[in-house]
UniProtKB/Swiss-Prot annotation:
Entries under InterPro entries matching the protein: Aim32/Apd1-like, Thioredoxin-like_sf
Family the UniProt entry places it in: Belongs to the AIM32 family.
Pfam families named among the record's database cross-references: Suc_Fer-like (PF06999)
UniProt lineage: Eukaryota, Fungi, Dikarya, Ascomycota, Saccharomycotina
Name this polypeptide is given: Altered inheritance of mitochondria protein 32
Domain of life: Eukaryota
Length: 273
């Protein structure tokens, strides 16, 4: 069942426009990096089974992120990228992103947000494999239905994992979160648009008295559809909502329709309809 039907009950076709908020943001983009206004956004992104946001990457600004964070030696993203194929189920896709979120500081341990679990989790990087087995692999009974038909002529190598008693420190994420893709060194379109959208979201949320965190996320795909925005509700029964082609004049409409009203705006929605 797709996310739109399962988690939200209503669609609205168009995003309300806030007059007087338009800015000529497209003129700041390079001529060889236009925004794709032709393609229907519905279905342009496969929503992952789980989305992990790495917060302990050590960067203060998104402009500092290298193009490929997963190649940064010694980083949690690199460690997980090396283990991913051996640990993660191909039937349960995991997206690993880096994010800059307000009021989250880096400590001695790795710190991540995990959705739709809606948990902030801390652990030592040496326990990364155990973390992945604990949080990023579905239960055995769920995996069983995806097992291939037995072939006696095919040699298989069993992947074993001995569970360790590790005390992963976790707590619920109590606030909604809005992230804007701002991975400048990956694509200049997101780098140019993100700071403007972040400021506009903060203003619109403040004007409505809403306590929602707003931050920046690394590459999530679809730079041609910038600005790319993900809304993570704090309600565990709701999945994240992915939008594309978000510009400043549409921010207030997203806050009113999606954050407050619980509606999906069809013209911006990158998930399956």
């Amino acid at each position: 069942m797709n996310i739109a039907r399962r988690y939200l009950s209503r669609f609205v076709e168009k995003c309300p426009i806030e007059r007087g908020c338009e800015c000529n943001i497209l003129s700041e983009l390079p001529n060889d990096k236009p925004i794709d206004f032709e393609k229907n956004l519905n279905g342009t992104s496969v929503i992952p089974w789980k989305h992990l946001l790495v917060l302990s990457h050590g960067f203060n600004h998104a402009d500092e992120w290298p193009s490929k964070l997963e190649l940064l030696p010694g980083s949690l993203t690199n460690e997980m990228d090396l283990l991913k194929r051996k640990v993660v189920s191909p039937y349960h896709p995991i997206m690993i992103s880096n994010a800059i979120v307000p009021n989250v500081t880096r400590g001695a341990k790795e710190k991540v947000y995990l959705y739709p679990d809606n948990k902030m989790i801390e652990f030592d990087i040496k326990d990364t494999k155990d973390f992945m087995h604990t949080y990023l692999v579905p239960p055995e009974e769920e995996m069983a239905q995806f097992e291939p038909v037995y072939n006696p002529f095919k040699k298989t190598t069993a992947i074993t994992w001995e569970k360790k008693k590790i005390d992963f420190k976790e707590q619920d994420i109590g606030k909604d979160l809005i992230l804007v893709c701002g991975h400048t060194q990956r694509d200049v379109r997101c780098g140019k648009i993100a700071p403007i959208l972040v400021d506009q979201f903060k203003k619109s949320l403040k004007d409505r008295g809403l306590d929602v965190d707003v931050g920046v996320v690394s590459h999530i795909g679809g730079h041609a559809y910038a600005g790319n925005v993900i809304y993570f509700p704090s309600d565990k029964t709701k999945k994240s909502i992915w939008y594309g082609r978000v510009f400043p004049e549409k921010v207030a409409g997203i806050v009113d329709e999606t954050v407050i009203g619980g509606n999906i705006i069809k013209e911006l929605y990158r998930g399956e309809v």
